[in-house]
C-alpha cells in the first residue's frame, strides 16, 4: 500500500509529462505545445523572435539570462505563428532575413530554416541555442575540449586554459561531410542539432566550424551556416536549412529526419524534391587507400558525397543548375569537371583523375590534402599548439629512409620550430636538375616556406592569399592548399648525403 507521501510524489511526476493539445497559446509570446511524448513546450518572443523558454519533460532547458536565436538576436522582427493541420509554423521577418520554425504534432523537434538576402551585420550566419548548463553540461561527440568554463584566456577571447588543458569552442568542430549531428546532454536530457542540408552554406565538404561551447553560464549548441572562420568561399544567399533541434531523454537520435513537409509550409526559397535532380556515375584513378569524395558547387549551392569502395556515387538531390564537379583523394583534388543538373532527372557523369608526379627522389607524407600522421596532427584539432600534451615541436630533423612521419611537424612556426631539416641520400643519377615541391594546406599572416638545398638558397616565394583568419591555433588545417615549387639547379644535389 502506498503512503500519502509516495502517492503525491507519483502524481507530481506524472503531471510533469502530461501533454496539453497540440497548439499555440498567444500573449506577449507564442507558447508552442508540440504534443509530444516527454512533452516539449517552447516560447517565442513576439517582438524579437528569441526562444525564451524550452520545457522538455517538465524541465526548463533554456538559459534564463539570454534567449536562443539566429545570429546574436534579431532585436526586433515581425513575428507570426500559424497552425495548419498537424503543423505549426513560426515566421520571424526583417528586411533581409526570415527565420522559420516548424513543429509537427507529436514530435519533440523544432525544425528551422533561415532565408537571407544579405549577410548579417555581425559577419556570420548562425543559430545559437543557449541552454541550461546545470541540466545539460556535456558536449558530444568530443567532450570537454570545448568546455571553457572558468578558463583563463590565452589567445584572443576564444582559446582558454582550463585545469592545465587548452580549450576552445573551435575544438568542437567537425568536417561538414561528417557532421550530421552534434549534441549537448545531461543525465536526463539530450539536445541535438541535426544537419541534413548544407546546400547554401559555404566552404565545401571539408570546412568545419563551431558546434558547441559550455562557457559556464550556459551551454551553447550551434549551427554555423557561414562565417569567416578559415572560409574559402563567398557567402551564399537564399534558404539555409532545414536544420532540426531534437530533444530526447537519453538515446542519440537518428539523423534520418523527414523535412519534406516544408514544401507545404510556404517557406521562401524551399525547393522540394520534385524540383531537384541528381548526378550519378563512377569515380576512378585515385589511390584506393584513401576515401574518395565527389563535390559539386556553384554560386548558389554546394553538395557532396563519399563514393562507394568501387567508386560509384549518386549525389544528394540538387537544385537545377550548372556545377563545378570535383573529385578528391582524401581532401586532395585529383580532377575537376562540369555538369548540368535538371529538375526531375538523373544525369550520368563519370570522373577520373590521379596524382601525377615525375620520378621521385623522396616523398614525406601522402597526397591526401591533410596533415595526418605528421607530428601533433592527432592533437591539433582538439587543442592549442602550446598545450603541454603536444609533443615537442622542434626544430626537428627528418632523415629520409629512417625517420618516421611523426619526426616531421604538421605545422612550422617561424619563432618556434623553424627551420625543419631534411637529410636524404642521392645516387649519381639523381644529381641533375630537380624540383622540390612543397604542398601546404594552410597559411597565416603571409607565412610561406623558403628552402635551402645544400649551399643553394631558393628564392623567397610571393605571399599566399591572406585568409584573414586564425587557423592552426583554432583547430583548422585546411586553407587554399598553396603549392611551392623550388627549382633546384643541376649539380646542387650531390651523390651521397644532402641537406
Swiss-Prot record:
Its EC number is 4.2.2.23. InterPro entries: Carb-bd-like_fold, Gal_mutarotase_sf_dom, Galactose-bd-like_sf, GH-type_carb-bd, RG-lyase_II, RG-lyase_III, Rhamnogalacturonase_B, RhgB_N. Keywords: Carbohydrate metabolism, Cell wall biogenesis/degradation, Disulfide bond, Lyase, Polysaccharide degradation, Secreted, Signal. GO terms for molecular function: carbohydrate binding; rhamnogalacturonan endolyase activity. Disulfide bonds join 49-92, 183-192. Gene3D superfamilies: 2.70.98.10, Carboxypeptidase-like, regulatory domain (2.60.40.1120), Galactose-binding domain-like (2.60.120.260). One of its GO terms (biological process) is cell wall organization. It comes from the Eukaryota. The keyword Lyase applies. It catalyses: Endotype eliminative cleavage of L-alpha-rhamnopyranosyl-(1->4)-alpha-D-galactopyranosyluronic acid bonds of rhamnogalacturonan I domains in ramified hairy regions of pectin leaving L-rhamnopyranose at the reducing end and 4-deoxy-4,5-unsaturated D-galactopyranosyluronic acid at the non-reducing end. GO terms for cellular component: extracellular region. Belongs to the polysaccharide lyase 4 family. Pectinolytic enzymes consist of four classes of enzymes: pectin lyase, polygalacturonase, pectin methylesterase and rhamnogalacturonase. Degrades the rhamnogalacturonan I (RG-I) backbone of pectin. This is Rhamnogalacturonate lyase A. It comes from Aspergillus niger.
Amino acid at each position: 500500500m502506498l503512503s500519502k507521501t509516495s502517492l503525491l510524489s507519483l502524481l507530481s511526476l506524472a503531471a510533469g509529462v502530461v501533454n496539453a493539445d497540440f497548439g499555440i497559446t498567444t500573449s506577449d509570446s507564442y507558447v508552442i505545445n508540440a504534443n509530444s511524448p516527454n512533452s516539449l513546450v517552447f516560447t517565442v518572443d513576439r517582438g524579437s523572435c528569441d526562444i525564451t523558454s524550452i520545457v522538455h519533460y517538465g524541465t526548463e532547458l533554456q538559459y534564463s539570462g539570454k534567449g536562443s536565436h539566429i545570429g546574436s538576436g534579431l532585436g526586433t522582427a515581425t513575428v507570426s505563428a500559424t497552425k495548419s493541420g498537424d503543423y505549426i509554423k513560426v515566421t520571424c521577418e526583417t528586411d533581409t532575413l526570415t527565420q522559420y520554425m516548424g513543429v509537427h504534432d507529436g514530435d519533440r523537434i523544432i525544425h528551422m530554416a533561415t532565408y537571407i538576402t544579405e549577410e548579417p551585420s555581425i559577419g556570420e550566419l548562425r543559430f545559437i541555442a543557449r541552454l541550461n548548463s546545470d541540466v545539460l553540461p556535456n558536449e558530444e561527440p568530443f567532450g570537454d575540449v570545448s568546455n571553457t568554463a572558468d578558463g583563463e584566456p590565452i589567445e584572443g577571447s576564444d582559446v582558454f586554459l582550463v585545469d592545465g588543458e587548452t580549450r576552445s569552442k573551435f575544438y568542437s568542430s567537425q568536417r561538414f561531410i561528417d557532421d550530421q549531428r552534434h549534441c549537448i546532454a545531461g543525465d536526463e536530457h539530450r539536445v541535438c542539432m541535426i544537419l541534413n542540408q548544407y546546400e547554401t552554406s559555404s566552404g565545401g565538404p571539408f570546412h568545419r566550424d563551431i558546434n558547441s561551447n559550455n562557457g559556464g553560464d550556459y551551454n551553447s549548441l550551434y549551427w554555423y551556416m557561414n562565417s569567416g572562420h578559415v572560409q574559402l568561399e563567398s557567402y551564399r544567399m537564399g534558404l539555409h536549412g532545414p536544420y532540426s533541434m531534437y530533444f530526447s531523454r537519453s538515446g542519440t537520435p537518428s539523423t534520418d529526419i523527414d523535412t519534406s513537409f516544408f514544401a507545404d509550409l510556404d517557406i521562401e526559397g524551399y525547393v522540394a524534391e520534385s524540383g531537384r535532380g541528381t548526378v550519378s556515375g563512377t569515380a576512378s584513378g585515385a589511390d584506393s587507400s584513401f576515401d574518395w569524395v565527389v563535390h559539386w558547387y556553384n554560386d548558389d549551392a554546394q553538395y557532396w558525397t563519399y563514393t562507394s569502395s568501387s567508386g560509384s556515387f549518386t549525389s544528394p538531390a540538387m537544385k537545377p543548375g550548372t556545377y563545378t564537379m570535383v573529385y578528391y583523394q582524401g581532401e586532395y583534388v585529383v580532377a575537376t569537371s562540369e555538369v548540368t543538373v535538371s529538375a526531375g532527372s538523373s544525369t550520368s557523369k563519370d570522373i577520373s583523375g590521379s596524382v601525377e608526379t615525375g620520378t621521385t627522389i623522396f616523398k614525406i607524407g601522402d597526397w591526401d590534402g591533410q596533415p595526418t600522421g605528421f607530428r601533433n596532427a592527432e592533437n591539433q584539432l582538439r587543442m592549442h599548439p602550446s598545450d603541454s600534451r603536444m609533443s615537442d615541436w622542434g626544430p626537428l630533423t627528418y632523415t629520409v629512409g629512417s625517420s618516421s612521419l611523426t619526426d616531421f611537424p604538421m605545422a612550422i612556426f617561424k619563432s618556434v620550430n623553424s627551420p625543419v631539416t631534411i637529410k636524404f641520400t642521392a645516387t649519381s643519377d639523381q644529381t641533375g636538375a630537380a624540383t622540390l615541391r612543397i604542398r601546404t594546406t594552410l597559411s597565416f599572416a603571409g607565412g610561406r616556406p623558403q628552402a635551402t638545398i645544400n649551399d643553394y638558397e631558393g628564392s623567397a616565394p610571393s605571399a599566399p592569399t591572406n585568409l584573414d583568419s586564425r587557423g592552426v591555433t583554432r583547430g583548422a588545417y585546411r586553407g587554399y592548399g598553396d603549392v611551392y615549387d623550388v627549382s633546384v639547379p643541376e649539380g646542387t644535389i650531390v651523390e651521397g648525403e644532402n641537406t
